[in-house]
Amino acid sequence: MRNISRKDFLKIGAALPLAMHSLSLRAEQGKKRPPKRIIFINSCLGFYKPYFYPKKRGDLSTSDYLKGMKTKEKMTVFQNLFHPGMETSNHDSEKSFLTGTPSPESPTFVNGMSLDQVLARQMGGDTRFPFLNFSIYDRGWGISWNDRGSAIPPMHDEQKIFQMLFEKEDLKAKKQQLQNDQNILDCLRRDLAQLRKQGANAGKLESYQAVIAELETQLNHEKFWLNTSKPKVPKSLSDDQEFVFSTKIRNLFELAKLAFRTDSTRVITLSMDWISGAIKVPGATGAWHTLSHHANKPNIIAQLSKIEIDTLKHFNRFLFEMDQIKDGEGTLLDHTTVVMGSNFGDASNHTCDFLPMIVAGGGYKHQTHTVLEKQTPLCNLYLELLHKHNIDVGSFGSSQKDMGLLNS
């Protein structure tokens, strides 16, 4: 386990069955203060640094990109974060955005467990969906990785996500699916027993047993929620076909907001992965990846900035609307930690230092803009987020210490 110690991993793993037992206490917990929630958003080609960071330290009104944010008092921009061991990782660095595992470009690379999954083990037991993973398009992986270092495929079809979250299921078909899953699980248990008889090595047995335990937990979780009605919400997705890329981002943010608002989940990832070919946003048409290699040419930067401004427009709207939803004595944003950033500090040169990172909401006393020491490990921030969500671990990835900057 590269990104978290074995001792800490076992401690976290123990929380998963405990979380399942806590389901019966859900109604009682609902009477207490609102639960904590968290979302991680990765824009895989980063943001043009001169426009992203404030020109005057601590003053977001001097950032070309962020000056229009409506919730500036509830966000902090962190400057000078990086992931060690990514000097030659290029686009592969996206795989390590939430793990901090070095050298993802290596043919022998094995990823660690991503931060969202560590949190989901602690936070996911009381909701229908322990976690949700979204992406712009379907390539089979995003920024979420399980404890075996395997990618957890994200969902990208907005209509199917809405259907999964809020539309009534065919109960008979669902029961049959769960029975089929149970049959598969029984077969796997028999296979495991046979492997034990054959004297398979301990490592193989442990891995096999871990898979079975994970599937069993998932199956029991689905059975628990089988007869519980899904929340009903009006369908508020955009069908604008002129700006498909922009519409997709807007809709995924909308789905994240609805999922949090209905307490369907408490952990979400959103991977803004780049699409080959031209995309169209208000004011610009071009290939996002090609434009990101701007070579400091003003005309190309002007086009690139339109794409990045459009992305941040939807981010701004998401934060503002979350902050308008009453949740306990505060707002939904106050009880949701929003982490937005990138695996690239400069996509034009494929560098992975000076990573742009925003933390918003969460009820923290935000500092608007914090300039850290150069080459501060991003995993220091991740470690602090784990601690803020009551997960007592000593380290995560390349972390050196808890930053101690997100005070409540």
Question: Where do the protein language model's features map onto the residues?
Answer:
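Ligand-binding pockets and gating/stacking loops
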Residues: M1-S408
